């Protein structure tokens, strides 16, 4: 049942990457071979100028092994997750870098540094995670949010989650993404809180709290992505069956959804944290190199857009 098809970096991202200026990017926890291999790929492709943060001796040793030239690269010699994460965030807060890549540090450590009220990267929005999903052989991009950071977001938080995902879609060239707010069904049911909350989100969005998109819901997943399902169920909506962004009610749905696409369909899940002062590349240890590379390109695109 598991797919053995190779993972693919979306061609359109590779094309966009050709025209990008290098993005200065802090690598939080660069003292790891897998991380440095990703850094080498993105550096040689002209996507980033990395600032390597971690144990300098290990960084130099591993760089020699994988063939990463560090002579012209800045290395910040630090150990310990808190110190490494804090240094990456400090570089972003001072505008020394325009993006952060999570390397060999735990997500919690990096996120704690990013949301620190005194020294972090807070903006007026809630920080949230967006998966950029693509399937080999298909052109359609689907953004899934939030499957990694916010566990059980309330309606106000989900409004920011939606705004952050819309920003990603805009940066990638979709000026009016179709946003589907997910639940277990398309009918509002008081015994299904996500449907009630979904209806509230749509009502507030239509009153002007969210713009730059077409938004509808609550929808079950089939209605969000399948034109045939929408037709059979008689749903008349410009979003039904055409969603570019799906907004999940909780982390369990988002995490399960993206992993099913990865393992059953060889979907490439490029993870980005939005809502902070800079985009943060957030991938897991189980992710293929292609996912980290795609996420790095996306972060560079977003960072470039924020600086123009």
What are these model-derived regions, one by one?
Residues 1-52, 56-239, 244-308:
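Anion-binding alpha/beta catalytic cores of soluble intermediary-metabolism enzymes, centered on
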């Amino acid at each position: 049942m598991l797919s053995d098809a190779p993972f693919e970096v979306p061609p359109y991202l590779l094309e966009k990457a050709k025209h990008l200026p290098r993005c200065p990017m802090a690598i939080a926890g660069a003292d790891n071979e897998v991380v440095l291999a990703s850094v080498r790929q993105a550096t040689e492709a002209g996507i980033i100028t990395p600032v390597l943060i971690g144990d300098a001796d290990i960084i130099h040793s591993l760089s020699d092994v994988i063939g990463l030239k560090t002579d012209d690269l800045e290395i910040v010699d630090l150990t310990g997750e808190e110190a490494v994460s804090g240094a990456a965030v400090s570089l972003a807060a001072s505008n020394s870098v325009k993006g952060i890549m999570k390397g060999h540090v735990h997500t919690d450590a990096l996120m704690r540094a990013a949301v620190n009220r005194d020294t972090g990267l807070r903006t007026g929005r809630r920080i949230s995670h967006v998966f950029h999903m693509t399937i080999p052989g298909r052109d359609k991009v689907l953004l899934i949010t939030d499957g990694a950071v916010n566990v059980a977001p309330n309606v106000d938080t989900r409004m920011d989650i939606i705004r952050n995902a819309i920003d990603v879609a805009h940066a990638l060239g979709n000026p009016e993404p179709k946003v589907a707010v997910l639940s277990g069904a398309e009918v509002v049911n008081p015994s299904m809180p996500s449907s009630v909350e979904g209806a509230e989100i749509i009502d507030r969005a239509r009153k002007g709290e969210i713009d730059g998109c077409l938004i509808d819901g609550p929808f079950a997943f089939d209605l969000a992505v399948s034109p045939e399902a929408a037709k059979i169920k008689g749903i008349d909506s410009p979003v039904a069956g055409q969603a570019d962004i799906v907004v999940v009610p909780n982390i369990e749905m988002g995490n399960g959804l993206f992993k099913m696409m990865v393992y059953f369909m060889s979907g490439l899940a490029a993870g980005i944290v939005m809502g902070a002062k800079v985009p943060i590349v957030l991938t897991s240890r189980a992710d293929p190199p292609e996912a980290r590379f795609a996420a790095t390109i996306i972060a560079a695109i977003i960072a470039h857009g924020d600086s123009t």
